[in-house]
C-alpha cells in the first residue's frame, strides 16, 4: 500500500520526526493532494507525532484557479487541517521583475512557504515532487550541460525542505487517488508542450520508454544515487579545502537575503588556493558562492573558468562580475568573493 511505502521512506531518511510542524505546499493537483492525504493519515495514526499545515497560492493565471483554491480549502476543511491561501498576480510581478512566469511563480511560492513557516512556528516545508519530477529534472540538467551534481536531481531533503513522495511514481499516485475515491484538480497547462519540462514528460520520456528502455525512470534514479555518493565524498573534501584556504567570512549569515544586503564577503588565501587541484579549486569557488547566496543558480562553467584565470593573474581585469549579484576580486594576494549591495535611489 502506498501509505506504508511513504511511511517507510520517511522513517528511513528521518524526513519527519516527533515534534515537527510541517507546512505543505498544496496546489490541488494529484501529487500534492496525495501527499496531504497520506501525511494526514500518518499523523492521525500517531505513527509519528507531528502536525501539518497547508498553504495554497492562487496565481491568477488560469480561469480554473479559483476552483483549485476552493477544492484545496474544502479538502482541508474535511480532514480538519489549517489552510492558508494567498492571491498573487504572477503575470504582473513577472513583468515588473523582468522574469519568466515559471521562475516568478517558483520564487513567490517559496517565499509564501517561508512566510507561513515563520507565522506558524513550523520547522519544515513539504513539497510533493515525485520520482518522475526527479528524472525530468536530471534530463533537463543534462540538456543544460550541468556538472555531475546535476545528475542527482531533486533530493529527498534539502535543509528545511522535505519531499516524501520523491521515490513514488506518478502512475502509483494516480492509482492511490483512484482507490481512495479522490478526484484531484488537473492543471491543463501540464498538457501543453510549450515548456521544456512538459516536452520531456510528454514526448522524450515516453519515446525512450517505448524505443530503448521501459524502465528508464528507475535506471536514471539509480544513477542519481550513485552520483550522490560520489558527490558527498567530493563535497566533504571541498569543505576541508575551503576551511584551509578561507581566511575570513565577513557579514556572512545563514539568511542569504541579509548576505545580499550586507555585502557578505569570503576572503581566500590565493597562495593556498592556487596549490589545490583545479577540480577542487572550481568546487571551492562554487562552495563559496553557495555559502553567500544559498545557490549557484546562474553561475556557468565560463564564469568559473574566468575566476580561475583571475586567480592565476591570467586575465586582464583584477575583478569580475559574473552576474548582477556577485563580484570576485583578486587583491593583495587574496581572492574576495562578495555579494553586491543594491542601493535604492542611489547615486553611486
PLM regions and their residue ranges:
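Short, solvent-exposed polar/charged micro-motifs at secondary-structure junctions
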Residues: 93-97, 196-197, 229
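Hydrophobic alpha-helical segments, especially transmembrane helices
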Residues: 69, 107-110, 145, 198, ...
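Non-catalytic, surface-exposed connector residues within folded enzymatic/regulatory domains
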Residues: 51, 66, 95, 194, ...
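Residue-level marker of regulatory loop/turn positions in helix-turn-helix DNA-binding domains and
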Residues: 105, 193, 197, 277
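ATP-dependent adenylation/nucleotidyltransferase module used to activate substrates
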Residues: 1-141, 171, 179
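AMP-forming adenylation/ATP pyrophosphatase catalytic core
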Residues: 2-31, 49-53, 108, 156-158, ...
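Catalytic subdomain that performs nucleotidyl-dependent activation
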Residues: 124-128, 133-227, 243, 250-254, ...
Amino acid at each position: 500500500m502506498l501509505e506504508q511505502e511513504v511511511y517507510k521512506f520517511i522513517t528511513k531518511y528521518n524526513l519527519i520526526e516527533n515534534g515537527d510542524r510541517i507546512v505543505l505546499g498544496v496546489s490541488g493537483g494529484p501529487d500534492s493532494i496525495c501527499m496531504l492525504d497520506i501525511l494526514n493519515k500518518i499523523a492521525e495514526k500517531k505513527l509519528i507525532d507531528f502536525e501539518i499545515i497547508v498553504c495554497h497560492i492562487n496565481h491568477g493565471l488560469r480561469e480554473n484557479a479559483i476552483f483549485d483554491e476552493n477544492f484545496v480549502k474544502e479538502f482541508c476543511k474535511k480532514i480538519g487541517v489549517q489552510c492558508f491561501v494567498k492571491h498573487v498576480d504572477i503575470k504582473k510581478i513577472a513583468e515588473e521583475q523582468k522574469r519568466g512566469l515559471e521562475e516568478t511563480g517558483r520564487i513567490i511560492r517559496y517565499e509564501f512557504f517561508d512566510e507561513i513557516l515563520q507565522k506558524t512556528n513550523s520547522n519544515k516545508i513539504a513539497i510533493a515532487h515525485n520520482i518522475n519530477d526527479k528524472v525530468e529534472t536530471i534530463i533537463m540538467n543534462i540538456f543544460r550541460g550541468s556538472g555531475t551534481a546535476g545528475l542527482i536531481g531533486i533530493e529527498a531533503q534539502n535543509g528545511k525542505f522535505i519531499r516524501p513522495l520523491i521515490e513514488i511514481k506518478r502512475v502509483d499516485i494516480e492509482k492511490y487517488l483512484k482507490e481512495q475515491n479522490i478526484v484531484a484538480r488537473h492543471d491543463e497547462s501540464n498538457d501543453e508542450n510549450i515548456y521544456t519540462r512538459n516536452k520531456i514528460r510528454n514526448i522524450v520520456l515516453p519515446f525512450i520508454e517505448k524505443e530503448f528502455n521501459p524502465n528508464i525512470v528507475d535506471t536514471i534514479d539509480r544513477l542519481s544515487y550513485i552520483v550522490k555518493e560520489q558527490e558527498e565524498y567530493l563535497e566533504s573534501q571541498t569543505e576541508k579545502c575551503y576551511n584551509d584556504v578561507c581566511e575570513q567570512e565577513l557579514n556572512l549569515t545563514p539568511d542569504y537575503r541579509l548576505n545580499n544586503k550586507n555585502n557578505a564577503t569570503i576572503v581566500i588565501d590565493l597562495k593556498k588556493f592556487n596549490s589545490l587541484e583545479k577540480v577542487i579549486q572550481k568546487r571551492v569557488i562554487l562552495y563559496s558562492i553557495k555559502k553567500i547566496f544559498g545557490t549557484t543558480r546562474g553561475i556557468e562553467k565560463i564564469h568559473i573558468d574566468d575566476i580561475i584565470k583571475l586567480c592565476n593573474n591570467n586575465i586582464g581585469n583584477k575583478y569580475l562580475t559574473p552576474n548582477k549579484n556577485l563580484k570576485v576580486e583578486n587583491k593583495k594576494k587574496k581572492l574576495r568573493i562578495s555579494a553586491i549591495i543594491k542601493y535604492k535611489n542611489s547615486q553611486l
